[in-house]
Amino acid sequence: RQRQMCIRDRDMKTFPIGGVHPSENKLSRGSAVEPLPLPDLVNIPLSQHIGAPATAKVAKGDRVLAGQLIAEATGFMSANIHASVSGVVKAVEAVPNGQGMRQPMITIQREGDQWAEGIDRDPALKRDCDLAPAEILDRIKRAGIVGMGGATFPTHVKLSIPPGKKAEALIINGVECEPYLTSDHRTMLEHGEELLVGVTILMKAIAVEKAYIGIENNKPDAIAHLSLIHISEPTRRS
């Protein structure tokens, strides 16, 4: 049986009354995502996810490589954390976060651009995945992938189907929850192929035959773009 992703222009039911509908201020919707230069000093929180904070696996004075595991998940509801830069660990201590609250972080002084062994930096898109479902989930868990929403829910937990249960379909959330956000929009436009390949891999991971991508009607270009890719490359649906 062929797996299918559903990309349709379909109106969904909404609340009949009530709700708050703030004005959209998608000021950056037409601007491409650009990489920022690497900072000289980074503070990496040990809690970038809902659940238990990760446990630091490095100490002051250690040299680390980009992509290296520097903090390990503690329990099922937790997530691994990796170094975003190569350099020297300057401290493992509580540091004020963006909200002014102190939380444990690993501070790294950047030096060079060396990567951990086994990190695949080839930009070419790999469309084939011969991993078993359990292996896919293990890769996601080891990578420390979490949701980008406010809850930052560990992705391997989301994809863990309870024993005796079976999922009917995979739902991908392409809806932006705040008036100024455009990151989902730009991702669908700039990385549509990668997105659809990722969807097929997740479908395999949870053994479903259908996937739905939810996109707001204020993103007609994203809907058209993903639909075009989906139609022109049907092999990506299998």
Name each model feature, range by range.
Residues 1-7, 229-238:
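Single conserved hydrophobic/aromatic residue that forms the stacking wall/gate
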Residues 5, 58-64, 96:
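Acidic, glycine-anchored pre-beta loop/turn
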Residues 8-57:
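N-terminal, Lys/Arg-enriched amphipathic/low-complexity engagement segments
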Residues 41, 61-64, 169-176:
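Active-site-adjacent bridging/hinge elements
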Residues 54, 60, 77-80:
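Short, conserved secondary-structure segments in the cores of folded domains
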Residues 59-72, 91:
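Short, well-structured beta-strand-loop connectors
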Residues 77-83, 91-232, 236:
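Iron-sulfur-associated redox domains of electron-transfer enzymes in respiratory
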